[in-house]
Amino acid sequence: MSWRLWLKSKPKSVNLGFYGEVNAGKTTLANKIGKDWADQEVGVVSEIPHETRSIQKLEKVNFAAKGTKLDLTLIDMPGIASSVNPKDFMRHGLSANEAMERAKEATRGIVEAIKYLENVDVALVIVDATRTPFDQVNFTILGNLEHQSKPFIIVPNKIDLPEADIRLVRDAFSEYPVVPVSAIQGDGIETLYDKIAELARKMR
């Protein structure tokens, strides 16, 4: 395709879903992509667990990499957890009532995120590279993605931190595409963009 035809070609619409454990950096990465390509952020980042308790979207993100133009919708999912304990919120200063309500919202968000997977075209599975990747949550997410034949990328995040262990994540998910990044520093982000474009090109 000539560059003139490429400029005129209509971008492919892609729903890009951000999945992962609580506080793995999903929203930080979604915000990074949103700022890079649309000068907008998707959601609020917080140290309090389950800050994202409902699906958040940023539409009409004009993305281009490796000769591929995409019309992205960034879909930031609530963090997935095997259980939600109100005490985790109380440790961050919330009252008992506030913590209980937040726990209910977080639980609903987890269910919503899994159900919404059918609407996702490509998924980024964000893994905290400073924690063990051998967590049931990660394998639950991957199992759901594979069951629905969704293309995805494993994204070890926080690689700028000294305790990050990229090799361990690669070993844990050796059969899958793995692209390490630092969502805060921007390390590895261009490689991730290329991989997103590559998967999108293979979509029907």
Question: What residue ranges belong to the model's regions?
Answer:
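Active-site-proximal flexible loops/turns
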Residues: 38, 83-86, 135, 164-167, ...
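Conserved, well-folded catalytic cores of nucleic-acid-processing
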Residues: 36, 61, 80, 148, ...
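Conserved G1/Walker A P-loop phosphate-binding module
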Residues: 1-93, 97-98
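Canonical P-loop GTPase G-domain recognition
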Residues: 15, 158-204
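Conserved nucleotide-binding/hydrolysis micro-motifs of P-loop NTPases
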Residues: 51, 79-81, 130-132, 158-162, ...
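Conserved C-terminal guanine-recognition region of P-loop GTPase G domains, centered on the G4
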Residues: 101-176
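Short, glycine/charged-enriched secondary-structure capping and boundary segments
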Residues: 32-33, 87-90, 138-142, 167-171, ...
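Charged, alpha-helix-enriched surfaces in structured cytosolic catalytic cores
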Residues: 24, 50-53, 108, 186-187, ...
